[in-house]
Amino acid sequence: MAVYTDVSDDDLTTFLEGYDIGRLRACKGIAEGVENSNFLLVTDRGPHILTLYEKRVNPDDLPFFLGLLRHLAARDIPCPQPVAGRDGAVLHTLCDRPAAIVTFLDGVWPKRPEVRHCAQLGEALARLHLAGGDYAPTRRNSLSVDGWRPLFDAAAERADSVKPGLRAELETELDALEALWPHDLPTGIIHADLFPDNVFFVDDTLSGLIDFYFACDDFLAYDLAVCLNAWCFEGEREFNVTKARHMLTRYEKVRPLSDAEFAALPLLARGAAMRFLLTRLYDWLNTPPGAMVRPKDPMEYYHKLAFHRAVSGPGAYGLSR
């Protein structure tokens, strides 16, 4: 979460007149994140989150995202619920931006995830995948394998300024991923960005999943691969197989992986690492000095990609068949 658009008191007051959430007591910008402008609203009925959707979010996708939150919340997935205005709509306009209010979730995200966090994350992810199974709207994953080549092309000319030889390495890896990428794994709704800062815990118990604005239809096991990258490394290079084992084991207690999904884990993990390497590389090269959000180091995912390329098989992630 972050703040890119300032909202005046008058504009906010007028906007909130369209809702029945109580009298506003305080409004505070939330600094974390990279995509949208977010504010904590405190009223005499409790806290809510106000989001203004910035230019990187396609307004046409917002009904999909907000509808998904409603769908998942109705199936006991701990995620924010969109709040309807007095007109019955959940999407409105504030400061020339699409805007929505969602319920507030208690909890904090784990700065240093431990095994118990990874285990609960695995179970929650499997429950999310099952709960999304009957969500009718669809959204293509624009950041899957078909989207990596355009990202690479946009960054290729300056890639070697980040690491000498990076351009050639990435092109070789892209060629391999495009040739090997599977086509017939189980698909469904995935979160696609379930990093630790998007998962809340209260007293070490998982309490919420947030930031569904990359959610889409794709391979369910790809979502697991994203989480293996985001949760199971100590630093940039040391893979913690114990964390991975607990994550995957708890996932499989709810939704067992098919043999094909299990066999594809190393390839999917390579792809997930490539996805975040490329988006970080693009942002690293194109974020101007003095920008409010500091770009994340793409080399973290270069090292993670190297790990996945070197594994001997899916057993490297702690499970065996």
Swiss-Prot record:
Keywords: Amino-acid biosynthesis, ATP-binding, Kinase, Nucleotide-binding, Threonine biosynthesis, Transferase. It catalyses: L-homoserine + ATP = O-phospho-L-homoserine + ADP + H(+). One of its GO terms (biological process) is threonine biosynthetic process. It is an enzyme of class 2 (transferase). Gene3D superfamilies: 3.90.1200.10, Phosphorylase Kinase, domain 1 (3.30.200.20). The keyword Signal does not apply. InterPro entries: Aminoglycoside_PTrfase, Homoserine_kinase_II, Kinase-like_dom_sf, Pseudomonas-type_ThrB. The keyword Ligase does not apply. GO terms for molecular function: ATP binding; homoserine kinase activity. Pathway: Amino-acid biosynthesis; L-threonine biosynthesis; L-threonine from L-aspartate: step 4/5. It comes from the Bacteria. Its EC number is 2.7.1.39. Belongs to the pseudomonas-type ThrB family. HAMAP family: Homoser_kinase_2 (MF_00301). This is Homoserine kinase. The lineage of its organism: Bacteria, Pseudomonadati, Pseudomonadota, Alphaproteobacteria, Rhodospirillales. The gene is thrB.
